[in-house]
From Swiss-Prot:
This is Outer-membrane lipoprotein carrier protein. Participates in the translocation of lipoproteins from the inner membrane to the outer membrane. Only forms a complex with a lipoprotein if the residue after the N-terminal Cys is not an aspartate (The Asp acts as a targeting signal to indicate that the lipoprotein should stay in the inner membrane). The keyword Transport applies. The keyword Chaperone applies. It is found in: Periplasm. InterPro entries: LolA/LolB/LppX (IPR029046), OM_lipoprot_carrier_LolA-like (IPR004564), OM_lipoprot_carrier_LolA_Pbac (IPR018323).
Length: 205
């Protein structure tokens, strides 16, 4: 009987720990109402041993606005106004327009824009490494192995780490972070440059 009680206490304490970590992470994400930052991104491909470094800037405004602009080594922009998602490749002069989806596997940083942060509990098992670092393990997603979110002591986003099932590792470090800034909604509408090849998937059946 003692063993059963001890096992129950152990399992219960683990569940409480997961719940506390999830609640802490949700509180931190909820406190990000708007944000601008520069980023440095490093992609390590374990299959080819190739590394790719890129940098740029991003901005978000809850509940639906998002912009991710890569300025080096190539010009790429991902912009969403909550209804449409524009993916622009400046080198190819190509723009793909999609309907917005909450595909965290494709864009892991969308977790920061989640309209219902309680969904984090449904999608991930969350553990806290310390007061400012959290590991998210997807419950169903087969593309992502884990996401690590690190905050600074004053609760600003410091970096994201994403590991995938394809043996790829991405680390995105943020700097010059500003939160609760006033950002115009119209800045999240994308206007294609002249002579851009446009593929509008929102018009497909």
């Amino acid at each position: 009987m003692k063993k059963i009680i001890i096992c129950f206490i152990f399992v219960f304490s683990i569940n409480v720990s997961f719940a506390d970590a999830t609640s802490e992470l949700i509180d931190k994400i909820k406190n990000i109402h708007s944000m601008t930052a520069n980023f440095n991104q490093k992609l390590i491909d374990g299959q080819t041993n190739n590394n790719l470094n890129s940098k740029g800037n991003m901005s978000l405004k809850k509940p639906q606005y998002f912009k991710w602009i890569t300025t080096s080594p190539n010009n790429q922009e991902i912009v969403s106004n909550g209804t449409k998602l524009w993916i622009y490749d400046g080198d190819l002069d190509q723009l793909i327009i999609k309907k917005v989806s909450n595909d965290i596997a494709q864009f892991p940083y969308l977790i920061l824009l989640s309209k219902n942060t309680n969904n984090i509990n449904k999608l991930f098992t969350v553990t806290a490494q310390d007061n400012n670092s959290y590991i998210l393990k997807p419950k169903n997603d087969q593309m992502i192995d884990s996401i690590k979110i690190k905050f600074t002591p004053n609760n600003q986003l410091e970096y994201l780490e994403i590991s995938t099932s394809l043996n790829q590792f991405t680390k995105i470090e943020f700097n010059n972070v500003k939160t609760d800034v006033d950002i115009s909604n119209t800045s999240f509408d994308f206007k294609a440059p002249q002579n851009t090849d446009i593929i509008d998937e929102t018009k497909s059946a």
